[in-house]
Amino acid sequence: MIFLTLEHILTHISFSVVSIVIIIHFLTLLVNEFVGLYDSSEKGMLTTFFCLTGLLITRWIYSGHLPISDLYESLIFLSWIFSIIHMVPYFKKHKNYLSTITAPSTFFTQGFATWGLLTDMHQSKILVPALQSQWLIMHVSMMVSGYAALLCGSLLSAALLVITFRKVIRIVGKNNNLLNDSFPVDEIQYMMEKKSIFKNTFFPSSRNYYRFQLIQQLDHWGFRILSIGFLFLTIGILSGAVWANEAWGSYWNWDPKETWAFITWTIFAIYFHTRTNKNLEGLNSAIVASIGFLIIWICYFGVNLLGIGLHSYGSFTLISN
């Protein structure tokens, strides 16, 4: 009873604090002068991390296993990983470009786990025989950690695309006005002028310097986080294959979860291929990573709606009986 009460308290404290952090982020976006509020938001995320850590430890103690065996527990674990990713640039004294992604991710993930799922799903249950293995911690923790890192990296790539295409639209609009006012509608002149404007835009002039730096940082951090996430995902898939062979006598069974995990791995393998190809890097790799964001959610969450396959123990019902 004490553990359940403590878990309840930690859950509400962590969600309340991260909600305040989100409000602070909105305020700092509107008013840049609130530097003190930004520092408070970082301390708030640190508080959220400790509350989620205490929540996971408490649940581990009274359940007897690492709390990653069902959808509710994995969502809390996912929120915890988001909070860790959030604090890495903070402790390294880098400008935290991740904060606008990791803080809302923590908020929405924990919010859905706490308020979006049925109350019965919050209760800790005895592990089914298939999960009573030493491979549980390795496989599930690596997969969820990989999902968290890949989601953050994908959102950074999506942000890069938004900033870049907004700039392209502005340039093209400027170019069209220039053509209408100064030149006849001639295709050759249009292409020459368009090429010239694009070339000048990517120079870090005084007007575009901040945006240029932001794009470079988004690309840099996105690549680093996606690299870590891809490594975790690979380890998770390999450890899962070994576990499957021990439990079911086959390394791979092509059930929905395994199939979408393979699709996810393939998408991000394509991303890293485009990064090594000078003709495809930049926007092309960012587009691939952005597609990967949707694929991850289908793999992690969407497949659970089916409730079929060897991973059906992680599924849930939408309507309570």
UniProtKB/Swiss-Prot annotation:
UniProt keyword Thylakoid, yes or no: yes
GO CC annotations, alphabetized: chloroplast thylakoid membrane; plasma membrane
Membrane topology type: Multi-pass membrane protein
GO biological process: cytochrome complex assembly
One Pfam family linked to the record: Cytochrom_C_asm
Transmembrane residue ranges: 17-37, 48-68, 71-91, 98-118, 143-163, 225-245, 259-273, 286-306
Domain of life: Eukaryota
InterPro entries according to UniProt: Cyt_c_assembly, Cyt_c_biogenesis_CcsA, Cyt_c_biogenesis_CcsA/CcmC
Membership in a protein family: Belongs to the CcmF/CycK/Ccl1/NrfE/CcsA family.
Function statement: Required during biogenesis of c-type cytochromes (cytochrome c6 and cytochrome f) at the step of heme attachment.
Alphabetical list of HAMAP family matching this protein: CytC_CcsA
Assembly mode: May interact with Ccs1.
Descriptive protein name: Cytochrome c biogenesis protein CcsA
